[in-house]
């Protein structure tokens, strides 16, 4: 085996993902501690967690940005990304999962699967990321490992298989039986759970563990269908199966996404974290196991298949931008093929711009170490890239490849923002520009009619935190308006326009003539502008100007000035004047033409619909459902467990402002709710008329 193959098989790129407060960051902190990366364990509730390095995170005790770090365990190098669990920061989860090879999903032993766990799980399904699960907080009142496993099967459709059987629960949780080695692991309290001893399985658990182990083996046999020898052993002599054989089949099942093994522990009390580290190495895939990478060759538009090789052509994905007061702009990248050296010149193939790398950094939360090169499988950061943003591909000059992009959701909430003093105007513009580069779900636009600057994001907390960062990092004070719904506009039928822009005011005039056809695009696909000009009726050098004009025209809608989405525009015909035509004339004409076409294409206003989950005592269930119905909500279903009910609904965001407060008074403070963007839908006609009047 060559050095390169050996190295690659020893790398694990993993994410730690979960619902807010399931104990994700604490689990990561313990991993860093045991793998010798930190000498003192950081506690989230003390504001000392290494991975939560932004001041806002330490104050609020939640994780906002995905911090990246590298640790070593059992001769493997593990790159870990700790992702946020709060729904306003889903882009952080989305972009992390896009570059990971495997993930650990952390669940709370009391709550099991919570709404945000479902979102994160769906995102991981989309990118086909293999997962193992860790049921955390086994020492809490009401902890129930097997109920958590069942909720994973029911709510996530996961093939969740217990590999542990807890010994005791709540304050009596002392260890677990490892169903693979058939040993009971007891944590030694005087070592704070850092050490344990192996003993025989307790008498009262022997029968249950034997059943669980047989169920595990049966499941593995069905997952690895082609392995007849394993199947025969399970049927005829399950006790003869070795640990090694089980690990091999388990690894194959996890990598193929057919099985999700579930471990248990309590990270805060240090129980079960080393066992988790062992299986991260044993079961989760290396970059080599994820196999061939698919991209598009820009020269001939054909699909390219790249093997993860050190000496292959360079293909890397920028998945996060960070601004550092000392170093400047830092771009986080994942290398899928080839090697990237410090000082090298590369191509951003998404933007067709040349870039130069001045420094390469290995990150540990916000500490950094300089490196001379990164190679296939590495996750690291580079300094010196000017144009690259989230989702861009970096490659060799002569190998123009574009990798699959990261899906970026549309923002759902708007706020007007202005500097407190005239002197802050420039600083505010710089801050907004830097923050929108870092976070693709944060948009900055200006309202043409009022001249106001509008910031848009994924929720109130999202915009709150960005405002905090402006004050702290950019020293800029700003006034913000009340949160407003971020409406969009779209068209519902085909339309066309023929527009001439002619100006004659002595001397050289202006002339442009553009014909467009527009049609609705698939929901969520965004706007597309294509040129179908043939025979040079509009010269080639003017076509980019027409496209730019069309794109700018789509930024403000024709009903109420909200941006148009999901519109497909084709430039089909036009004409020009030898002397009077210019790029400016064609740009203005493109913008006018698309507006005219949209007016004829039955435009409508869209509003963000939120997926809402309310957990309430059953005696308040009727009130909660009635209230959601009054808010134009559509009830999707409800489920009950232990005198509590969970109601799932889809409700327009415009009806949900201040919902937490009214839910509290409706249920005497006993109900809780979560909310996340689901999709955009057409606004009812009556409400559309009110919005247009405003």
From Swiss-Prot:
Belongs to the TRAFAC class translation factor GTPase superfamily. Classic translation factor GTPase family. EF-G/EF-2 subfamily. This is Elongation factor G. Catalyzes the GTP-dependent ribosomal translocation step during translation elongation. During this step, the ribosome changes from the pre-translocational (PRE) to the post-translocational (POST) state as the newly formed A-site-bound peptidyl-tRNA and P-site-bound deacylated tRNA move to the P and E sites, respectively. Catalyzes the coordinated movement of the two tRNA molecules, the mRNA and conformational changes in the ribosome. It comes from Chlamydia caviae (strain ATCC VR-813 / DSM 19441 / 03DC25 / GPIC). One of its GO terms (biological process) is ribosome disassembly. It is found in: Cytoplasm. One of its GO terms (cellular component) is cytoplasm. The gene is fusA. Keywords: Cytoplasm, Elongation factor, GTP-binding, Nucleotide-binding, Protein biosynthesis. It holds the Pfam family EFG_IV.
């Amino acid at each position: 085996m060559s050095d390169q193959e050996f190295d690659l098989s020893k790398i694990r790129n993993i994410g730690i993902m979960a619902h807010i407060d399931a104990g994700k960051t604490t689990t990561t902190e313990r991993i860093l501690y045991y793998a010798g990366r930190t000498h003192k364990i950081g506690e989230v509730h003390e504001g000392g967690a290494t991975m939560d390095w932004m001041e806002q995170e330490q104050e609020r005790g939640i994780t906002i940005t995905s911090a990246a770090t590298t640790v070593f365990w059992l001769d493997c190098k593990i790159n870990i990304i700790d992702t946020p669990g709060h729904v306003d920061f889903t882009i952080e989860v989305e972009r992390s999962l896009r570059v990971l090879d495997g993930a650990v999903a952390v669940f709370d032993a009391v709550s099991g699967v919570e709404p945000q766990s479902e979102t994160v799980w769906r995102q991981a399904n989309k990118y086909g990321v293999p997962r193992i699960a860790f049921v955390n907080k086994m020492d809490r009142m009401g902890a129930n490992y097997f109920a958590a496993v069942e909720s994973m099967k029911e709510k996530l459709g996961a093939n969740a298989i217990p590999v542990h059987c807890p010994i005791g629960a709540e304050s009596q949780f002392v260890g677990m039986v490892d169903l693979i080695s058939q040993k009971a692991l007891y944590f030694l309290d005087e070592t704070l759970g850092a050490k344990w001893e192996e003993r025989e399985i307790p008498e009262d658990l022997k029968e249950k563990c034997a059943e669980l182990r047989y169920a595990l083996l049966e499941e593995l046999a069905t997952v690895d269908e082609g392995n007849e020898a394993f199947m025969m052993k399970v049927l005829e002599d399950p006790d003869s199966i070795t640990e090694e054989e089980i690990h091999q089949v388990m690894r194959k099942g996890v990598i193929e996404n057919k099985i999700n093994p579930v471990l248990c522990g309590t990270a805060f009390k240090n129980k079960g974290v080393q066992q988790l580290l062992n299986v991260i190495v044993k079961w989760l895939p290396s970059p080599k196991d994820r196999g061939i990478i698919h991209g598009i060759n820009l020269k001939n538009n054909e699909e390219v298949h790249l093997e993860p090789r050190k000496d292959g052509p360079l293909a890397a994905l920028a998945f996060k931008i960070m601004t550092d007061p000392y170093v400047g702009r830092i771009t986080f990248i994942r290398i899928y093929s080839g090697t990237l050296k410090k000082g090298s010149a590369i191509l951003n193939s998404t933007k067709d711009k040349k870039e130069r790398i001045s420094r390469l950094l290995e990150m540990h939360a916000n500490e950094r170490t300089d490196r001379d090169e990164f190679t296939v499988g590495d996750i690291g950061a580079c300094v010196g890239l000017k144009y690259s943003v989230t989702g861009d591909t970096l490659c060799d000059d002569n190998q123009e490849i574009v990798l699959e992009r990261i899906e970026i959701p549309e923002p759902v909430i708007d706020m007007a923002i202005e500097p407190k003093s005239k002197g802050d105007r420039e600083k505010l513009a710089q801050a907004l520009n830097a923050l929108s580069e870092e976070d693709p779900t944060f948009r900055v636009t200006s309202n043409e009619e009022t001249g106001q600057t509008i910031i848009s994001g994924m929720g109130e907390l999202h915009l709150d935190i960005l405002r905090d960062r402006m004050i702290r990092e950019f020293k800029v004070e700003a006034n913000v308006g009340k949160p407003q719904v971020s409406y969009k506009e779209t068209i519902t039928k085909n339309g066309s326009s023929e527009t001439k822009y002619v100006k004659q005011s002595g001397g050289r005039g202006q002339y442009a003539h553009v014909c467009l056809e527009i049609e609705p695009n698939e929901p969520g696909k965004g706007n597309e502008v294509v040129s179908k000009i043939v025979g040079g009726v509009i010269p080639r050098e003017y076509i980019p100007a027409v496209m730019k004009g069309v794109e700018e025209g789509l930024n403000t809608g024709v009903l109420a000035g909200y941006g148009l989405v999901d519109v497909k525009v084709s430039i089909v015909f036009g004409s020009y004047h030898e002397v009077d035509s210019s790029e400016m004339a064609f740009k203005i004409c493109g913008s006018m033409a698309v507006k005219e076409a949209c007016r004829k294409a039955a435009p409508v206003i869209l509003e963000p619909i939120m997926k809402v989950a309310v957990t309430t005592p059953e005696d308040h269930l009727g009130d909660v459902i009635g209230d959601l119905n009054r808010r134009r909500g559509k009830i999707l279903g409800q489920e009950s467990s232990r005198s509590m009910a969970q109601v799932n609904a889809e409700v327009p965001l415009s009806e949900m402002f201040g919902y937490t407060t009214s839910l509290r008074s409706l249920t005497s403070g006993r109900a809780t709710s979560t909310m996340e963007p689901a999709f955009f839908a057409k606004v009812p006609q009556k409400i559309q008329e009110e919005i247009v009047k405003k």
